[in-house]
Regions:
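Loop/turn elements at helix/coil->beta-strand transitions in domains of secreted/extracellular proteins
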Residues: 27-31, 59-63, 85-89, 112-115, ...
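Active-site-proximal beta-strand elements of phosphoester/diester hydrolases
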Residues: 29-39, 117-122, 135-137, 145-155
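N-terminal, active-site-proximal structural segment of metallo-dependent hydrolase catalytic domains
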Residues: 2-8, 12, 16-87, 97-105, ...
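Conserved hydrophobic/aromatic beta-strand scaffold that supports enzyme active sites
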Residues: 34, 63, 105-107, 133-137, ...
Length: 279
């Protein structure tokens, strides 16, 4: 990717991330992204064009909750981090999974805007989840300290795992004594895996806000909202109302390159914006 095209790509991404809005733009806000990066490891890091696009995507957010890190080795993660601006740090969860194909959750964050207070992998004593949710408790410069819960739901057991998520939320609200919780990730909460009409009963509106409801979050020809942000009602007080899906196959022109959009990922990144203080 030449510098001119990369610059254009980043400008277009900025337009996607900073939509016109009637909200007061002088208030300090943060942008949080969730991204199933699809089988991240040595092979993906060996494709320079893929890596440059991923770096461009990730660099537009303040926190990025990543799913599907498959590499046994840590060096692909470290090499990717070295390509990001120095302000970014990360935490990474344990390798999770019942089979030999295990995954890690990876949360990248702007160290100038956030402090990691605590991190934890949910103690799944009943073995409900294929990959136990990974939680990070963040402190901001304002009143909005929050727990981020990163999760990747198993497609073949989506309903059982999704139904267990409110218990995970309650666990961390009690453990860290903070009602502000953001649950995000690849829920596989649509299509043949899950009846998405069940979400409103699992996450009732008096306790939660479901930000993504009918947006297409998959690169495939089918239209499904697999990826989600679900936040507690307390956290919704900080939500600006701005959110979106980064359809990188439309933002970026792939015609002159050897890679296909599906080699970047089979999912689009999703994002939501929050105030750091009550506004």
């Amino acid at each position: 990717m030449n510098k001119k095209k990369l610059a254009l790509f980043l400008i277009l991404l900025a337009l996607v991330f900073y939509p016109a809005s009637g909200e007061n733009q002088s208030a300090q806000t943060i942008k949080i992204m969730s991204f199933n990066i699809q089988t991240f490891g040595v092979t993906k890091m060996s494709r320079p064009e893929v890596v440059e696009i991923l770096v461009g995507l990730v660099s537009q957010a303040d926190i990025i909750a990543i799913q599907e890190v498959r590499s046994i080795r840590i060096d692909p993660v470290q090499r990717f981090m070295a390509l990001l601006p120095e302000k970014y740090g990360y935490v990474i969860g344990p390798r999770e999974g019942r089979s030999s194909s295990k995954e890690q959750y990876w949360v990248i964050y702007d160290t100038e805007k956030f402090t990691v207070l605590k991190q934890d992998s949910w103690p799944d004593t009943d073995d409900i989840f294929e990959r136990s949710p990974f939680s990070v408790y963040f402190k901001t410069s304002g009143a909005f300290d929050f727990t981020l819960i990163d999760n990747h739901i198993r497609p073949s057991d989506a309903e059982n795992e999704i139904r267990a998520l409110p218990a995970v939320v309650t666990y961390y609200v009690d453990l860290w004594n903070d009602p502000d919780v953001l649950v995000m990730g690849d829920f596989n909460a649509d299509g043949r895996y899950f009846d998405k009409t069940l979400l409103n009963s699992i996450f009732p509106e008096d306790k939660y806000r479901i930000i993504f409801t009918d947006e297409d979050t998959t690169v495939a020809a089918s239209r499904n909202t697999y990826d989600r942000f679900i936040i507690t009602s307390s956290a919704s007080d900080y939500f600006t109302g701005n959110f979106g899906v980064i359809r990188f196959d439309e933002v970026y022109d792939f015609s002159g390159y050897s890679i296909r959009p599906s080699q970047v990922s089979d999912h689009y990144p999703i994002w939501a914006e929050f105030y750091v203080d009550h506004f």
